[in-house]
Amino acid sequence: MPILIVLMFLLGIDLSKKAFANIARNPKAVLLGLIGQIVVLPVIAFGVAWLLELSPVYFMGLMLVSCCPGGSSSNVFSMLAKGDVALSVTLTALSSVITLFTLPIIMEFVSVSVSDMSGVEINLPIGKLLVQNLVLIFVPMLIGGLFKHYFSNAAEKVKKVLSKVAFPALMTLALVFFYQYKSEIIDNFAVLGLSAAALILVAMLCSSGISRIGKFNGSVRRTIVIEVGMQNADQAIAIASSPFIFNSGEMALPAIIYALLMNVILLTYVYCIRLKLK
């Protein structure tokens, strides 16, 4: 959870008037990007989980990943892929706010559906989920934005320091979970890896199609592909393992596998893009 707070604080520092001005500058790109993240991605995840007949706990875990906002590291990947970084920041910020409300709604529908399909009763404490998301997502973003507004020079220095430790810390968290649940991961790696990879790749393909419908330029298309392909796995881990919500380390496993594969797939994508643009 502390890592998630740091990431959201950094996102708040990144926010600026230019980021929100991007909504007026390119509203179609913002709208289609958000549709890809908030609507299309959960549909893909549900389809993947259903087709692969995931167990209820893994079904919920994969859906949880798909309902989370874009990952903050997507801004860095957009820059590396020579995308529209301002659009990336805008989509990440807006999706982080919107999913405060869409995540509980979608997960409530999913929990009922999974219960009906499996016969296993799943209770989702929506109120606690909403409160935790406000505390872990919205409040740190707000504090980061206010810190940047009133102490801009100090904010830039803090950003440089935290940016260097945030991503390694996230990977360390994933590895710690990996070690704690290594037997479960080894036993289920084939299906978990396949489901996570399928979610990422199908999401990237669909977002590429969406961006082509919008007739965007290459930088905008690449940004939308990355934004839809990179979700905030840390938030999914925090929700799944929270003692106030699901209190299930096993439910966090799809997010852990997703985080590892997401970086491999997106780094490969960025490498191919940079080769193409040479």
Label every model-predicted segment.
Residues 1-278:
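Alpha-helical transmembrane segments of multi-pass small-molecule/ion transporters
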